[in-house]
Structures are given as C-alpha cells and as structure tokens.
Amino acid sequence: MNEHEFAQKTIAIRRKVREQRPLVHHITNFVVMNITANVTLAVGASPVMAHAHEEVKEMAAFAGALNLNIGTLTPYWIDAMVMAGKVAEQRGIPIVLDPVGSGATPLRTGAAKKILAEVGVNVIRGNASEVMSLFADKETVNIRGVDSLETVDAVRHEAGLLAGELEKVVAVTGPVDIVTDGTRTLEVHNGTPMFGRVTGTGCSATTVISCFCAVEPDLLVASAAALGYYGLAGEEAARISNGPGSFQAALLDTLYNLPEKIIQEKLRIREVLP
C-alpha cells in the first residue's frame, strides 16, 4: 500500500471501531489506568480495567482485545495476565503486550518473557530497549545506552529478527515507529516530542493499537494504522496546546475529533521493501 491507501485504511479502521465499540480489556498499571481508559473512549472503543483473579477469565472471554501492561508489577498481576491471556488465546482474541521497563530489572524482564512463553501474544509494543531486552539473554540491559545508540536501520533489523523468531507483530516506537512481522515492515513518521513530556503516552499508544486490533484482522496494518493515527493526533494536539497539561487534554480531544481530511493529508505510513 502507498501512503494514500494507508490513510484510507486508517480511516476505515477508525470507522469500524466507532461502529462496533469493541470492549478492550486492560490489565495495566496504576499510573495510566485513567488516561488509557479515556484514550480508549476517545478512539471509540469501550474500556474495562479488571485484574482480579476471580473475574479476569470471564472479562477476557467477551473482550474484543486484551491489553497487557507490566508497568506496576506484582506476582499477583503477572498471574492475572497469564490467566486472561490463555482465555483470550483460546478464543482468538488479539493480545497486545506492552513490556514497560523490560530490561530495567529482572522482575520486569522475567515477567515479559513469562507472558510471552505462556500466552499467545499477537502484538508487542515497546521502545527499542524494551524490545531488545526480550531478544537478549541478559535479564537487564543498558536502557539509556540502547535508546541513544540505536539507529532506525538497526531498530528495523532487530525488530524484524525478533518478530520472525517469535512469530508476532513487533512495534518499536521512537522518532520513527517501526512495525514488522518479520516479513513485512512498515514505518510510521507521525508523532511529536510532546509525547515525552506527559506520562502514559507510550501506554496510550498501545491502547490505540489494542482498539484497532479488535476490529482489523491484519494486525500488522492495524498496529501501524493505530500508531499513525495516534502520532498524527499528537501532532495536532501539540500545535494547539501550550504545555504538557493542555497537551494531554488536547490529545484526548484530537483523538476524538481528528478529521478524516487531516488523516488523508498528513498520515505518513510507508512500507519498507526488503
């Protein structure tokens, strides 16, 4: 697909989300529960935040997508993610993993790898260091070093290797977002530095991916379209805001109101040929 076709596909997916209003089951962290629930609503889906062992299986069973986020971990929550994930996998419900901080501590890295080993995760969304930690033998990596040294070409190469090895869609977010399944690779050139000034913007990107995956069977395209849509909303929000506080509010408004004309004109998704 060319950029125009990706824009049309993104518009079609957003329309479908708003028509179907899929339930997106989040087992996520305390820091971002409120903002990611609101992002889900702004995109057009329905959020539920449920992590109690007594209900996660039931909730996952009738969700349109399952969003697993390891930002504030306990062993109890890890078990809840595995329980919900197994039900979602059995029912063919897309599972999106955000390995927040993987590589920073053995707990986080171990939790991410445990979920990947025991649950049929479909999409992984993280920054370069988080994604590399899933590929490395070590339990910790130099997060600052990885983020500063990686080039777009290197990230694209390593993400492709990981996606091919795990047979999953891998989305690495950064100045240029890379989305790959090991065979096809897409680049997303939308976004804003303001994402780095407000907490939860990465987790919110994963939420939009989950919403789009709930209605679009091609999870590679759904993930790239979600990141393009989210990045473009961020660009427009940054343009009309005056700082982090107004940006956060403007981002919700823009996710809700982003005109299709702007998507057609400004979405920047392209396929990278091997």
Curated annotation (Swiss-Prot):
The family database entries (Pfam families) matched by this protein are listed as: HK
Q: What SUPFAM superfamilies does its record include?
A: Ribokinase-like (SSF53613)
Q: What is its EC number?
A: 2.7.1.50
Catalysis performed (reactions): 5-(2-hydroxyethyl)-4-methylthiazole + ATP = 4-methyl-5-(2-phosphooxyethyl)-thiazole + ADP + H(+)
User: Which residues pair up as cystines?
Assistant: none
Molecular function GO labels: ATP binding; hydroxyethylthiazole kinase activity; magnesium ion binding
Residues the record lists as binding ATP: R125, T173
- Signal peptide range in chain numbering: none
**Which annotated residues bind substrate?**
M49, G200
Which co-factors does it depend on?
Mg(2+)
Keyword annotations: ATP-binding, Kinase, Magnesium, Metal-binding, Nucleotide-binding, Thiamine biosynthesis, Transferase
> Which NCBIfam families does the record match to this protein?
PRK09355.1, thiM
What does this chain do? Catalyzes the phosphorylation of the hydroxyl group of 4-methyl-5-beta-hydroxyethylthiazole (THZ).
What protein family is recorded? Belongs to the Thz kinase family.
Q: What's the protein called, per UniProt? A: Hydroxyethylthiazole kinase
The gene is thiM
